[in-house]
UniProtKB/Swiss-Prot annotation:
GO terms for cellular component: plasma membrane. This is Putative ATPase, plasma membrane-like. Residues 1-66, 116-245, 294-555, 606-622, 686-697, 748-813 are cytoplasmic. One of its GO terms (molecular function) is ATP hydrolysis activity. SUPFAM superfamilies: Calcium ATPase, transduction domain A (SSF81653), Calcium ATPase, transmembrane domain M (SSF81665), HAD-like (SSF56784). It holds the Pfam family Cation_ATPase_N. It is found in: Membrane. Residues 87-94, 267-275, 578-582, 644-664, 719-726 are extracellular. Keywords: ATP-binding, Magnesium, Membrane, Metal-binding, Nucleotide-binding, Phosphoprotein, Transmembrane, Transmembrane helix. It is a multi-pass membrane protein. The chain crosses the membrane at residues 67-86, 95-115, 246-266, 276-293, 556-577, 583-605, 623-643, 665-685, 698-718, 727-747. It comes from Arabidopsis thaliana (Mouse-ear cress). Belongs to the cation transport ATPase (P-type) (TC 3.A.3) family. Type IIIA subfamily. The active site is at D331 (4-aspartylphosphate intermediate).
C-alpha cells in the first residue's frame, strides 16, 4: 500500500502524459496493479485526489439572487407604476410608491423562498442519478458510485456504460466508443488495449477492463454532468406558453390604458392626476407578477412528488410533455418482462447423437462470463450444478450489438482447445430455450393505460394469419428502426419512449419524453428526460397521472391569472369611464398583497381528479377560459357598482344604508366585492366537476378564509383618508357576500359550457375508444406472449380491429 508521501508523489507524476506511456509504466507511476486497489488505499487516495465529479457551480450570493428576482420583465411594469405614482399621483403618491415597493419586496421574498425549496428538490433528484460503475477493490468486483474512483482503480466497461473517468484499456479485444459529444467524430471509434478512453464517452460495443488515470476536474471533459444540465435547461413549449400569457396580460393592460387615456384625458378632459391613478389601478391589479415563479415552483414541487413515487425528472419541463403523451412506445425486456432469464432444461433440443443436454448447458455456460454477468450469462451459469465448471483458461470475444453474438475460446483439462458461441441466432435459442416471463402486473398495467388515455395496443407480427393487427413490428428491431418509428409517430402524436439499453439512446433523445427504466444503462439514463427507480409499468402510470395533476395545477393558475387581468382591466375601466368613479390604487394594492398568500397556497394545492386523457397547456383553452371568466366577473362588478351607487335596490331589499353619493363607503364595498370574487374563482377553476363535489386543498381553503376574513374586517371597520375609504358595517358586508355567492354559481355552469365548446364531441369519442381497447384487451389472457418458432416472433396482443380505427400504441421486442 502506498504511503501518504508516495500518494503526493503520484499526484505530481499524474501531470505526465499517462495516456501515451506504455501500460506497465502507468502501473508503476500510479503504484497499482491489475488486481486493483484495497478499500483502505482507495479511501486514502480519495483524500488526495478528491471525489470523481465536477465542482458544483458556486451559488449566487443571496443579494444578487434577490435583486435578480426583483428585476424581472413583469416587475419592470410594476416598477414603472411606482415611478409614476411618485412623480404624477396626487399628494398620496409617496405612500403609494412605498406600497408598490412593499408589494415587490413581498413577492420577491416569496419567490426567493420557493425557488430555494425548488433548488433543494432538484439537488435531491440529481443525487438519485449519481452514475455507477463496477470497480475492483480488495480483489472483488462491486458496483459503486463513480464518485469514489481514484487513479489506480481497475474498472469494468461494458456496452451502455458512460465511462466515468479517463482510463487506459487493459487486455482484451476492442471497444467501440462513441465520443462524438467530446470530439465531434461521427460514429463509434474503435479502441484497443493500451489506448485511452475519456470520461463522458459511451461504450457502444465490447467489454474490457481499464485502469483509471484521471478523475473529476482532472479528466479531459465533464460531459456526464453536462448531459444532465443541458436537458434540465430545455424549456421549449413551456417557456413559449408563459411568454404568450404574459404578452396577453400586458396587451390587455395596454389596451385598457390606451382607452382610458383617450377617453378620460382628451374626451372627458379629466384631471391628469386622476388619469394617472386610474392607470395605476390597471397596472397594479392586472400584472400577474408572480406567475413565472409560481409555475416553475409548481413543476419543481411536482417533481418532488414524482421522485417519491419512483420517478426522477432530469428535465423539469418534461412534466408538461409527460402529461401530453398519447402514444407510449415500450421496450420489451425488463419492462413488459421481468428481465430474469431462466433455462427450461425440459425444452432443450439436441441435434447431435453424441451430445447430451448437460453438455449443451456446459458449452453455453463456458461461453458466459463468471464475473460481471449479464442476465443471459447468469441464466446459463446458474443452470450448472457447480458454477465452477464454467471456467478454464479462456480468450473472450465480447458481445457484439451488430452480430448479437459472443464467443469464448477455452482449454479443457486434456489441453484440447474449444470455441463456443452464444447469441441470438435462432438455432442457438432453440438449443437453450431461454425464457423471459411476463410480469404479473403487465395485464392490469396495460388496462390502466387504456383507461387513462395511454392507448397501448397490438404488438405482434404474424406471417400466416387472417388477423388484422393495428401495429406490427418484427422481432429484434435495431436502433435505427426504433428511431424512425418514433420520428413517424411524432408527426401526429406526443410520443413517449421507454428504454433501457445503449441501442435505445437515439430513440430516447428523439422522443418527446424519453423514459429510462430502473437499472437502465448509464447511456440510456443520460439520454432520457425521466428516470424510473422502480421496476415495471405501474410506476409509469403513477408518473403519467402525477404529471397530469401537475399540469392541471399549472393550467389552473394560468387561467386564474388571465381571468384576474381581464376582470381588473375591463371592470375598473368601465366604472371609471361610465360613472367617472376613480377606484383607489391603494385598495388594488391591498388586494394584490393579500393575494400573495393565496398564490403561495396554490403551489401547495393537490389536484385530486387529474384529466383522464392526455393534456397540455393549450393557449387557446387558457385564453378562451380566462377571457370568459374575466369578462363575466367584470360584468358582475360593474352591475354591483351600478346597483349600489346609482340605485336604491340594496337599501329597499335588505334595509341597508344608501351608498349613493358616498364615495368612501362605496370604495370599501367595491373592494370587498372584488376581493371575494377574485379568490373564490379558484374553487371553480381547480375542479373538473362541480366545485362543491371536489374539495379544495386544506391549505388553499384556509388561505381563502384567512384572507377574506382580513378583507371583510377591513371593509367593515377601515377609515383611511389617504385611500379614500370608510367602513361599511356588517350589514353591507353580509349583502356583498350574498351577492357574490349568488353570482358565483353561474361560473360553474360556464365552465362546462366552455369545455364543451372547446372539445366538442372529443370526450365521447375517447370514451368509445377506451371501451374498444378494453374489449380487445380481453383477448390478452388467451393470446399473450406466444412464441411462434416458425418465424420467431412474439405476440403480446392479438387484435382483430380494422386498421382504420384510430388506435394509438406501440411496442417492440
Amino acid at each position: 500500500m502506498a504511503t501518504g508521501d508516495s500518494l503526493e508523489d503520484i499526484k505530481i507524476e499524474i501531470d505526465d502524459d499517462l495516456e501515451k506511456i506504455p501500460i506497465e509504466e502507468v502501473f508503476k507511476k500510479l503504484r497499482c496493479s491489475r488486481e486493483g486497489l484495497s478499500g483502505a488505499e482507495g479511501k486514502e487516495r480519495l483524500k488526495i485526489f478528491g471525489p470523481n465529479k465536477l465542482e458544483n457551480k458556486k451559488k449566487e450570493h443571496i443579494t444578487l439572487r434577490f435583486f435578480a428576482l426583483m428585476f424581472k420583465p413583469l416587475s419592470w411594469v410594476i416598477q414603472a407604476a411606482a415611478i409614476m405614482a411618485m412623480l404624477f399621483a396626487n399628494g398620496d403618491g409617496r405612500q403609494l410608491f412605498l406600497g408598490i415597493v412593499c408589494l415587490l419586496i413581498v413577492n420577491t421574498i416569496i419567490c426567493y423562498l420557493k425557488e430555494d425549496d425548488a433548488a433543494n428538490v432538484v439537488a435531491m433528484a440529481r443525487a438519485g442519478l449519481s452514475p455507477k460503475t463496477k470497480v475492483l477493490r480488495d480483489g472483488k468486483w462491486s458496483e459503486q458510485e463513480a464518485s469514489i474512483l481514484v487513479p489506480g482503480d481497475i474498472v469494468s466497461i461494458k456496452p451502455g456504460d458512460i465511462i466515468p473517468c479517463d482510463a487506459r484499456l487493459l487486455e482484451g479485444d476492442t471497444l467501440k466508443v462513441d465520443q462524438s459529444a467530446l470530439t465531434g467524430e461521427f460514429g463509434p471509434i474503435t479502441k484497443g488495449p493500451g489506448e485511452e478512453v475519456f470520461s463522458g464517452t459511451t461504450c457502444k460495443q465490447g467489454e474490457m477492463e481499464a485502469v483509471v488515470i484521471a478523475t473529476g476536474v482532472h479528466t479531459f471533459s465533464g460531459t456526464t454532468a453536462h448531459l444532465v444540465d443541458n436537458r434540465t435547461n430545455k424549456v421549449g413549449h413551456f417557456r413559449k406558453v408563459v411568454t404568450e400569457i404574459e404578452n396577453l396580460c400586458v396587451i390587455s393592460i395596454a389596451i385598457g390604458i390606451s382607452i382610458e387615456v383617450i377617453v378620460m384625458y382628451w374626451i372627458q378632459r379629466r384631471n391628469f392626476s386622476d388619469v394617472i391613478n386610474n392607470l395605476l389601478v390597471l397596472v397594479i391589479g392586472g400584472i400577474p407578477l408572480a406567475m413565472p415563479t409560481v409555475l416553475y415552483v409548481i413543476m419543481v414541487t411536482g417533481s418532488l412528488r414524482l421522485y417519491r413515487t419512483g420517478t426522477i425528472t432530469q428535465r423539469i419541463t418534461a412534466i408538461e410533455d409527460m402529461a401530453a403523451i398519447d402514444v407510449l412506445c415500450s421496450d420489451k425486456t425488463g419492462t413488459l418482462t421481468l428481465n430474469k432469464l431462466s433455462v427450461d432444461k425440459n425444452l432443450i433440443k439436441v441435434y447431435s447423437k453424441d451430445v447430451e443436454k448437460e453438455q449443451v448447458l456446459l458449452l453455453a455456460a463456458r461461453a458466459s462470463r463468471i464475473e460481471n454477468r449479464d442476465g443471459i450469462d447468469a441464466a446459463m451459469v446458474g443452470s450448472l450444478a457447480d458454477p465452477k465448471e464454467a471456467r478454464a483458461g479462456i480468450r473472450e470475444v465480447h458481445f457484439n450489438l451488430v452480430d448479437k453474438r459472443t464467443a469464448l475460446t477455452y482449454i479443457d483439462g486434456n489441453g484440447d482447445w474449444h470455441r463456443v458461441s452464444k447469441g441470438t441466432p435462432e438455432q442457438i435459442l432453440d438449443l437453450c430455450n431461454a425464457r423471459d416471463d411476463l410480469r404479473k402486473s403487465v395485464h392490469s398495467a396495460i388496462r390502466n393505460y387504456a383507461e387513462r388515455g395511454l392507448k397501448s395496443f397490438a404488438i405482434s407480427w404474424f406471417r400466416n394469419t387472417n388477423c388484422n393487427t393495428v401495429f406490427f413490428f418484427p422481432y429484434q428491431l435495431c436502433s435505427e428502426h426504433k428511431y424512425h418509428i418514433v420520428n413517424k409517430l411524432q408527426e401526429r402524436h406526443i410520443c413517449g419512449l421507454i428504454g433501457d439499453g445503449v441501442d435505445d439512446v437515439p430513440s430516447l433523445k428523439k422522443a418527446d419524453v424519453g423514459i429510462a427504466v430502473a437499472n437502465a444503462t448509464e447511456a440510456a439514463r443520460a439520454a432520457s428526460d425521466i428516470v424510473l427507480t422502480e421496476p415495471g409499468l405501474s410506476v409509469i402510470i403513477d408518473a403519467v397521472l402525477a404529471s397530469r395533476a401537475i399540469l392541471q395545477q399549472m393550467k389552473h393558475y394560468t387561467i386564474y391569472a388571465v381571468s384576474i387581468t381581464i376582470r381588473v382591466v375591463f371592470g375598473f375601466m368601465f366604472i371609471a369611464l361610465i360613472w367617472k368613479f376613480d377606484f383607489s390604487p391603494f385598495m388594488v394594492l391591498a388586494i394584490a398583497l393579500l393575494n400573495e398568500e393565496t398564490t403561495k397556497a396554490i403551489t401547495m394545492d393537490n389536484v385530486t381528479n387529474p384529466s383522464p386523457t392526455p393534456d397540455s397547456l393549450k393557449l387557446k383553452e387558457i385564453f378562451a377560459t380566462g377571457v370568459v371568466y374575466g369578462s363575466y366577473m367584470a360584468l358582475i362588478t360593474v352591475v354591483f357598482f351600478w346597483a349600489a351607487y346609482r340605485t336604491d335596490i340594496f337599501p329597499r331589499t335588505f334595509h341597508v344604508r344608501d351608498l349613493r353619493g358616498n364615495e368612501a363607503e362605496m370604495m370599501c364595498a367595491l373592494y370587498l366585492q372584488v376581493s371575494i370574487m377574485s379568490q373564490a374563482l379558484f374553487f371553480v377553476i381547480q375542479s373538473r366537476s362541480w366545485f362543491f363535489v371536489e374539495r379544495p386543498g386544506e391549505l388553499l381553503f384556509l388561505s381563502f378564509v384567512t384572507v377574506q376574513t382580513i378583507a371583510t374586517t377591513l371593509a367593515v371597520y377601515a377609515s383611511w383618508e389617504t385611500a379614500r375609504i370608510e367602513g361599511i358595517g356588517w350589514s353591507w358586508a353580509g349583502v356583498i357576500w350574498l351577492y357574490n355567492i349568488i353570482f358565483f354559481f353561474p361560473l360553474d355552469i360556464m365552465k362546462f359550457g366552455i369545455r364543451y365548446i372547446l372539445t366538442g364531441k372529443a370526450q365521447s369519442l375517447f370514451d368509445n375508444m377506451v371501451h374498444l381497447v378494453l374489449n380487445s384487451y380481453a383477448k390478452l389472457s388467451n393470446g399473450i406472449y406466444n412464441h411462434t418458432q416458425a418465424d420467431h416472433t412474439y405476440s403480446l396482443l392479438e387484435v382483430s380491429t380494422p386498421p382504420s380505427q384510430d388506435l394509438r400504441g406501440v411496442g417492440w421486442v
